[in-house]
């Protein structure tokens, strides 16, 4: 908990100089709670499941986000987007099966709860699209750090080292402030169903990095990545077709 508190605190401080106007309202407060809960359940889930299992369970998020966006935002989702998300998720399953799956019931429950709150804070990012993304993320990360500090044990111990500081800065800046800002910024411009399917690109990029580092990548993992990208392509295909029809309509009037 203390490590997560530091991660959120540093991520929020990094964004503060770029925030136009700090705002705190009910929705931003709820966003902070949802983000904190998602991170907490994800971290605790990893104590019981392998990263491959966590990937399968966490990436049910788009499947949860679609009904939530309909319920909370009244957003409409096309059949093409749903098909793309289902195909993308099947790619995650194929990818993870090649890593080995040994499910733990408590791990399943914790990671699925993480996916639910991930979907929920994603929907709330979209709901808050009228606010400055930098300000929203700075406030929600700083609030989240207070929650984590409150939940941290009074007595704790960890060993300072250069590697620890490098890891902390990495997860705080790139994996914290910047990643939340980019996710929020995408949700300002496109519907939840359009953005969430892009999350399937994360395992693909991670695998590409592993390949560059010399980590063994088997054919099954590559097949899973191909299916993920197929899902992303299909989910965004309808938008391209609609643009093409508009352009053609202009020229043929």
From Swiss-Prot:
It is found in: Cell membrane. It is a multi-pass membrane protein. Residues 1-97, 116-237 form the EamA domain. The chain crosses the membrane at residues 2-22, 28-48, 53-73, 80-100, 101-121, 138-158, 162-182, 214-234. Signal peptide: none annotated. It holds the Pfam family EamA. InterPro entries: AA-Vitamin_Transporters (IPR050638), EamA_dom (IPR000620). Belongs to the EamA transporter family. This is Uncharacterized transporter in sor 3'region. It comes from Acidianus ambivalens (Desulfurolobus ambivalens).
């Amino acid at each position: 908990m203390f490590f997560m508190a530091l991660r959120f605190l540093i991520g929020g401080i990094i964004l503060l100089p770029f925030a136009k106007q700090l705002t705190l309202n009910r929705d931003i407060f709820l966003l902070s709670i949802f983000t904190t809960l998602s991170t907490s359940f994800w971290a605790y889930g990893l104590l019981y499941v392998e990263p491959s299992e966590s990937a399968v369970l966490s990436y049910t998020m788009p499947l949860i986000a679609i009904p939530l966006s309909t319920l909370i935002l009244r957003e409409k989702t096309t059949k093409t987007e749903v098909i793309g998300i289902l195909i993308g998720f099947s790619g995650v399953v194929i990818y993870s099966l090649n890593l080995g799956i040994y499910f733990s019931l408590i791990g399943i429950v914790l990671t699925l709860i993480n996916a639910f709150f991930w979907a929920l804070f994603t929907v709330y990012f979209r709901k808050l699209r009228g606010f400055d993304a930098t300000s929203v993320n700075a406030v929600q990360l700083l609030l989240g750090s207070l929650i984590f500090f409150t939940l941290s044990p009074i007595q704790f111990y960890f060993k300072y080292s250069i590697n620890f500081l490098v890891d902390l800065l990495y997860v705080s800046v790139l994996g914290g402030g910047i990643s939340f800002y980019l996710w929020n910024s995408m949700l300002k411009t496109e519907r939840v169903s359009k953005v969430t399917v892009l999350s399937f690109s994360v395992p693909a990029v991670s695998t590409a990095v592993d390949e560059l580092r010399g980590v063994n990548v088997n054919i099954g993992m590559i097949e899973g990545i191909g299916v993920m990208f197929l899902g992303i392509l299909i989910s965004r295909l309808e938008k391209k077709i609609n643009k093409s029809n508009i352009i053609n309509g202009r020229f043929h009037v």
